[in-house]
Amino acid sequence: MTTDASARAIKPELLRTYTEDFNKDRANLIAADAAVSAGVLKAATDYRGVRALPRDFSIELKQGSITNQERSGRCWMFASLNTLRYELMHRWNLEDFEFSETYLFFWDAMEKSNTYLENVLRTLDEATDSRLFEAINWGPSDDGGWWQMFAALVNKYGLVPKSAYPESENSRNSDDFKQYLNSKLREFAAELRRRSAAGAGEDELRTLKDEYMGTVYRICAVSLGEPPEKFDFFARTKDDAEDDKKCDGKDESCKREDKSDAKACKCDKNKDKTGKDERPQIREIGITPLEFYKKYVPVDVNDFATLANAPLKSRPFNRRYRIRFSANVVEAGDMEFVNVPLDVFKKAALD
């Protein structure tokens, strides 16, 4: 290929051709007006296609109100919690329920910060411009994650309902919080490396790292509020459709002697409405997050494997892979996945 700069540049005569061609086609002008006024995505919407797209599904899970990650990178956390809340709602017959996403967000920030500083200690001999050290420093406490990270957090810290630890401005819109935290973590990394180069031993460096984690906790607590150690939980089970029906005498629980006499029935189904909510209640006082998870969530988060479809020549299918330096909870280990063909991936989603 030629290295002549003039041959590689955008030429003025071509620009004139481009603009002439653009203005010759009226469709381009209409599209430009629409995109400039409404935005590219709205302007590009095919409304005939929208009307033709079916909104009925062969598999549909009813799981309460819609959750919203807003302007944060917690998609993996919301998806994982929604998996558990579906099972919890059905197990305990609840109309709606939502876990606290902020609770896991707090501990994820703490754990990622700790793991980052540990990785810094593991790579003190790496050059600062090495690919490994650059990868470690890319986003020390960024929001992203996947199932194994979620499972590691739940195993260690449990879960709480949203009422016990609601959303905050910095969980809904995490950019400023994480930008500041990442900046401080990189400052800490630079000082650890400076102390190491000056001859500091492991004990001194670990003492310094523990002090830094105290600062990290303060940043997280100021930004998100402290997570609860214990909390109270109250919920009512939902009304069953059958409860609204009058007794017909065929139910085994019917207490009337004369099954043909509806007035003689003393079943709960025929009691007059009092206006008092008599649905069964779930009440917990001073329960811990781990106790809540073990008692009320009918799912073991460790009973899952991560599947991926990465059609790369260097990564053959049907093998398990581990990604170095990818842990959020350091003692839980790095992330692993099984690389499978797309048809296996689809079947797993349906099954």
Q: Where are these predicted regions, by residue range?
A:
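Structured alpha-helical subdomains that flank or immediately precede key functional sites
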Residues: 1-69, 77-351
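Catalytic cores of glycan-processing enzymes that make or break glycosidic bonds
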Residues: 73
